[in-house]
Amino acid sequence: GDFKYDRLLSKWAVFKEGADVDELVSHARYANVDAIHAKQSVEAVPLKSKKGLGGLINHGLLTHDLDELGISSATINIPISNFMHLSEQPGDILYTYGGKTYYFNEQYLISSFDVVLQQTSQRGISVAGILLIAPSGDAGELLKHPDYNGVAPYTMPNMTTVESTQCYAAALDFLAQRYSDPDMRIAHWIIHNEVDGGIHWTNMGDKPIATFMDTYLRSMRMCYNIVHQYDQHSEVFISFSHGWNIAAGGGWYKVRDMLDLMNQFSKAEGDFFWSLACHSYPAQLGNPCTWDDAQATFSM
């Protein structure tokens, strides 16, 4: 077709020749993460303390707040479909990936991300970008999972077609390249939001937990493999709520079950360095007295 496919996104399996169809006789394996070709190298951003801040935005008191708070880490939302286009709009940056050109709103990037990241980089703050995909705009429509329920604010990326997979990979490659700049740095990436609550947040329909995790793990691996071409110190984080042994909401998954599947998939398909980004909320979100939580037990 028109796409130049990067085998960094591929996995391989062993098949046995059959009379009518070939038979799968092994787990699929992804590329060895230690052998990913480095297009560039940057220094790690060390954590200086455990103090951090969530949800950075560009505002008039940003530099004052960063200086006064003395944080070492922070997060920033990266809503891909807000600034990515499939056809050129005025002021867009043209970016070619896999033989196809995609378009990114430069002014949005500057005002929403660049200005903030320049300030955090000057202060040695380790920033994690939270990858979010709202099913809006032409890029969001292409990236929308085919079983998205039409209600949740975000969709699981659609990795069921070459066109949509390449679009998602192009967004990841663009962001990884742009923000592996030491003067404008995103050090780590959080993959979507509260995936144990996929029914309400990162949605791909009502799926068995193993099916959901198989898809989510592909998104994590794509990000990890692409980013590590530009920043070998970067980690990808799985985003959880506070429902570890008990689901945090109706129709949600248990975090512990998801972690067990992460380990099983990684063992079978090739391990990589994933990390946890959990929301340490109380059982009742409106009551911060965690010592009163009856369900907060040592049960892991």
For each of these PLM feature ranges, what is it?
Residues 236-277:
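Substrate-binding cleft/loops of secretory-pathway carbohydrate-active enzymes
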Residues 6-23:
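Short, aromatic- and glycine-rich surface loops/edge beta-strands on solvent-exposed regions
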Residues 1-4:
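Aromatic sugar-binding surface patches on proteins
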Residues 9, 25-81:
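Boundary/entry segment of secreted carbohydrate-active catalytic domains
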Residues 66-67, 121, 269:
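Non-catalytic positions within long, well-ordered alpha-helices that form the structural scaffold/packing
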